[in-house]
Every structure is written in structure tokens, then in C-alpha cells.
Amino acid sequence: MSIVNGLVNRIDETYDVSQIEKEIKLDNIALSDLELLATGGYSPLTGFLGEEDYDSVVETLRLANGSVWSIPITLPVTEKVAESLKAGEEVKLVNNGNIYGVIQIEDIFVPDKEKEALLVYKTTDEAHPGVKKLYERPNVYVGGTIILTKRFENNQFPSYHLDPIETREAFKKRGWKTVVGFQTRNPVHRAHEYIQKSALEIVDGLFLNPLVGETKSDDIPADVRMESYEVLLQNYYPKNRVFLSVFPAAMRYAGPREAIFHALVRKNFGCTHFIVGRDHAGVGDYYGTYEAQEIFTNFTIEELGITPLFFEHSFYCTKCEAMASTKTCPHGKEDHVILSGTKVRELLRNGEIPPSTFSRKEVVEVLIKGLKKEVVTE
């Protein structure tokens, strides 16, 4: 266990867990968080947040020591389980009958979930998927440092499932000094492509890092999305300037706060820049269009350790006959074809084929095939 180049490493597969009797069952969110804590994806965190750090993150978007951190990474347990635990003991972390790690308990506390919902998600509305999940999870939090004792098998995308130390190495091998990260939970449409390629003009490489952890039920499945990224990169991007790897975290849908979180995590993966677009990590109408960009004004680039790149919403302009944004196009809204992942999903689900101004034909073919498969299995 160590910290090298600012990256936490909490992996020890030789760690003896045979004498540890107690266990905590992890849900899928906690399981993906355990992995990212251990591999350094969540550096400087070394475990699930204790009460002091939790309160500080919820209230100030910083850890108790002042480091920027915007999303509480917590380990919820039921009241019954909490009664059997005490600070100072080691407990196994289990999912599906497998022991994946241990936690050295430092803290057991009851959070104010309403306050967490209001400050982190800016709403207590249970129609919000992040708030819904927050309330569904157990009501007591356990804080403490973790050790990952077993690497996950059955990763859905083994060749794309890389630790921060591996992506950093890959960028170095390619000679990239500057790397821009792009977070997505949707297939890449033409507006995304325009933004990514605009960013590529000013950096050495693009790190396409789709989130493949838990998402809401109407998001396009990760395997379909991954195939869509592969065909897009293969046909429309210079191979030596892009790198694809998955981000195994769960989606929080926390808008502005999640934008900060996504930037900090991509810094750990080796990025120097991070793209923040319209309504980053948003859902419904809970956040303002550019609120996820505005939140960055509360922090300096030095303390973030990564430079955010802000982009206006892009569209296809029928007069320019090209992708553009309000910064580059003089024409009115009547000439703009607005693109969004939601719109693409809507068209596909209605049996319509998105036009080439929306999505590359190779991507559309993958999505249609995926949707047919989804219908068959439902």
C-alpha cells in the first residue's frame, strides 16, 4: 500500500482475511467505489468517508483537510449490521459471496440524508435517480480505510478496464504531454464529436472514458455504447490521438458537483484537461444549462490539478452546413438542428433512424442492433 505520484494504491492480494469474522455486504455502487478507492481513481481518498470528511464534503465540497472533493463516497449499512460493528475493528467487504476487501473501521455514523440530497443533488425529489438511490440505500454509514484483497473477475470489458497507473503509462508511451478527458454515459453523437475534435486541436491526446457502472434504466446499455465508441473511433478519429478506457463508477446524476468529481478522477487517470459541456452529469431539469461549468469558478486550477475546458452547446447549422456553436455561427435557432443523447434515444425507440447530421451511420447501425436485442430480451 502506497502513494506514488499522487496516486493511492490500496491493493494487497496477499492480505490474510481468514481470521476476520464479520462482514459487510456491498451493493454494486459500493463495490465499484471500493475498486476506484484501491486503484487510486479516487485519490486522495484511502477509504470510505468518515463523519468529519463526509460533513465537510457535503457542506463545502472539500475534505476536512481542505482538498477539493465534491461527492461523498460512503459505505451504507443497515441499523442491524451497524449494531454489530465497532470502531477499530477490521471487517470483510463482500459481494455475491466473494470477499473483495477489508475495511479498517474508524467511524460509524447516521447521516442526515435529506441534507445530503439537498446539498449534493440540489433537490429532495425522489423522482431524481440520484436522490432515489440515496434514500433506497441503508441509513448508517461506515467510514475507514480499505484494502482491496481480490481483483474483480468478469469485468464486462477486460481490455478496456484499466487502472489509473495503466492509463498514465499508456499516455506516456504515446508521448502525450497534454491529454483531455471526456466523460460520457451516452453514445457519442455529432455534437460530442465536434467538441472532442475541437479540444484535440489544442492537446496531444483525447481520453474517451465512458462510465460503465450503474446508470438509470433508460440509459443505453454499456455493451451497446462500447461498440458504438469502437466503430466511431475506428472510422472517424486518428488512431494515434485517442485512447478508450472505461470508468467503472456508478452514475450519480449530481450535475455540477459530479462535474468537479469527474474532473478530479480524470486527473488521477492522467489527464491535464477535462471537457465540461452543457448540463454535465445532469438529469431532467434539475440543473441550469451551464451550472456545471459555473461551479468551477469556486476553485483554482492549481487546487483542482486539472484544467476544465468549457464548451457551449453545439448543433448542426443547416445554413453553415456544418457543426457549430453560438460562438462560431451567426444564424438563428430556426437553422439549428439541436442534438442530444436523449433525442437520439427517443428517435431510435420510436423506430426512427437519426439523420447523419445527428449521428454517424456506423454508430446508428450499432444502436439499432442493440435496441433490437434489448426488445427481444425484455
Swiss-Prot record:
Keywords: ATP-binding, Nucleotide-binding, Nucleotidyltransferase, Transferase
Family annotation (SUPFAM superfamilies): Nucleotidylyl transferase, PUA domain-like
Entries under InterPro entries matching the protein: ATP-Sase_PUA-like_dom (IPR025980), PUA-like_sf (IPR015947), Rossmann-like_a/b/a_fold (IPR014729), SO4_adenylyltransferase_pro (IPR020792), Sulfurylase_cat_dom (IPR024951), Sulphate_adenylyltransferase (IPR002650)
Superkingdom classification of source: Bacteria
Catalytic activity, EC: 2.7.7.4
Catalyzed reactions: sulfate + ATP + H(+) = adenosine 5'-phosphosulfate + diphosphate
Root EC class: transferase
Alphabetized PANTHER family for the sequence: PTHR43509, SULFATE ADENYLYLTRANSFERASE
Record's protein name: Sulfate adenylyltransferase
Organism (species): Bacillus cereus (strain B4264)
Lineage of source species: Bacteria, Bacillati, Bacillota, Bacilli, Bacillales
